[in-house]
């Protein structure tokens, strides 16, 4: 017991020294004037120093960037020693030893990611009548950050039987950093606000076989429940076959979710949707091609305008965005997925630049320009109706009133999550690694994006 207390106090002392050291650095780099910093370091040297300590460039900065933000984060960390913990659901994944070995082999990519049986316990607040759900789980994620170790690995979960996990049949459990924390939650809340199909994403306190892991996020899968909650009729949901070698349009292969069920229940609809995808890939360059015959252009215009505001461009590339085939309209609607704000340099870019042929090199538009064939289907000057809708939503989403509405959502739904993340000194998202400084959510990024959009459309 004495050893544990000494160890705890030592760790606290080391962290405190680290805080003081970082405060000194931040005061110099972010609190002092630019001219003062240049007297000591050239901008080139300063940029290299930022890279060395894994600070992302300013356009991508979702870590603490000034004394005020630093104080906000470390205040929550300090108060966490005295305040009660968060009220997120407590969830435990229970797996036997043999299946733990299988999951570990999946994590290290020694075997295919096949499902193994497990159970999930949902703890009740009074510790009575805890709910046990039978599930099957497997590892998931392309980037190594999904597979750092067994404790932090991302999991795909399917419920076995008729039970549901907070209303979900299929979902993922993953470290919040893999989607840049609450930015992804905000994206989906705004999507649903605009009557687009958005996923449920919420925090839990995760335990694995008795070991407390920490705050993880649950992300909804692609099922009929998703469609019902978003007021859509049952219909095909389509992604990409990521096992194929090509993921660039049109050299890609589409993959239907729950394909066997779909073939048994809606064979005619399945065939129509599949044929339409084939026509899209083969006819998109024809002079008589019309996007109105394939896409709900109002929904896609909303998606692209919202993406410009949030810089969640990763969610619009073919690998990420999912299609829902609406059986009533015969058109494809977007399902937002994996927006992952902060994945590349979009400091000056919006989709409108594709029409005007500006900022279309990889230094300005990141991996968007690696998928020009896909985006040019929409951002072609002949698509007058689509472009008018897109400009309308750009105007709406970049307005002062809309930014105020977003701020209300942040205060109501995200602030308490962010405070819990600050209390744990959650590291900033470096996309492929954990950042040097703690994560911080900054609304100013959206106000700056709104200014950029307004300057481009007026």
Question: What do the predicted segments below correspond to?
Answer:
Residues 138-152, 163-168, 254, 349-376:
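Anionic ligand-binding catalytic core segments
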Residues 116-172, 177:
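Conserved oxyanion/phosphate-binding beta-strand-loop segments in alpha/beta enzyme cores
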């Amino acid at each position: 017991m004495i050893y544990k207390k000494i160890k705890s106090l030592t760790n606290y002392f080391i962290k405190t020294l680290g805080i003081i050291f970082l405060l000194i650095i931040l005061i110099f780099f972010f609190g002092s004037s630019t001219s003062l910093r240049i007297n000591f370091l050239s901008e080139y040297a300063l940029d290299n120093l930022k890279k060395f300590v894994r600070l992302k460039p300013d356009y991508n900065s979702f870590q603490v960037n000034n004394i005020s933000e630093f104080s906000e984060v470390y205040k929550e960390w300090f108060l966490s020693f005295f305040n009660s913990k968060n009220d997120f659901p407590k969830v435990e994944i229970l797996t036997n030893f043999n299946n733990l070995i299988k999951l570990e082999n999946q994590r290290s990519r020694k075997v295919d990611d096949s499902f193994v049986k497990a159970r999930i316990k949902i703890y009740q607040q009074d510790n009575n009548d805890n709910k046990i759900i039978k599930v099957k789980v497997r590892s998931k994620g392309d980037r190594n950050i999904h597979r750092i170790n067994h404790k932090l690995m991302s999991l795909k979960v399917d419920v076995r039987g008729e039970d549901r996990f907070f209303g979900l049949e299929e979902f993922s459990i993953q470290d919040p950093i893999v989607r840049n924390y609450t930015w992804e939650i905000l994206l989906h809340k705004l999507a649903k606000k605009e009557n687009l199909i958005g996923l449920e994403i919420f925090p839990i306190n995760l335990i694995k076989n008795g070991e407390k892991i920490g705050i993880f996020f649950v992300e909804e899968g692609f099922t009929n429940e998703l469609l019902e909650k978003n007021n859509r009729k049952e219909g095909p949901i389509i992604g990409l076959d990521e096992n194929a070698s090509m993921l660039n349009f049109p050299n890609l292969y589409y993959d239907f979710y729950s394909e066997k069920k779909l073939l048994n229940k809606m064979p005619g609809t399945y065939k129509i949707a599949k044929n339409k995808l084939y026509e899209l890939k083969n006819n998109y360059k024809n002079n008589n091609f019309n996007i109105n015959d394939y896409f709900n252009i109002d929904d896609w215009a909303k998606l692209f305008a919202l993406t410009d505001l949030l810089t969640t461009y990763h969610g619009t590339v073919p690998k990420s965005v999912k299609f829902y085939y609406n059986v009533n309209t015969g058109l494809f609607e977007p399902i937002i997925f994996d927006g992952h704000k902060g994945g590349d340099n979009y400091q000056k870019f919006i989709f409108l630049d594709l029409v005007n042929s500006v900022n279309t090199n990889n230094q300005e538009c990141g991996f968007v320009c690696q998928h020009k064939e896909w985006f040019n289907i929409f951002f072609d000057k002949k698509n007058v109706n689509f472009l008018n809708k897109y400009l309308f939503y750009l105007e709406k989403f970049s307005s002062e009133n809309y930014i105020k509405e977003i701020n209300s959502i942040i205060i109501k739904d995200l602030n308490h999550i962010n405070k819990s993340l600050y209390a744990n000194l959650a590291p900033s998202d470096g996309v492929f690694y954990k950042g040097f400084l703690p994560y911080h959510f900054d609304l100013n990024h959206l106000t700056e994006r709104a200014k950029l959009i307004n300057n481009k459309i007026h």
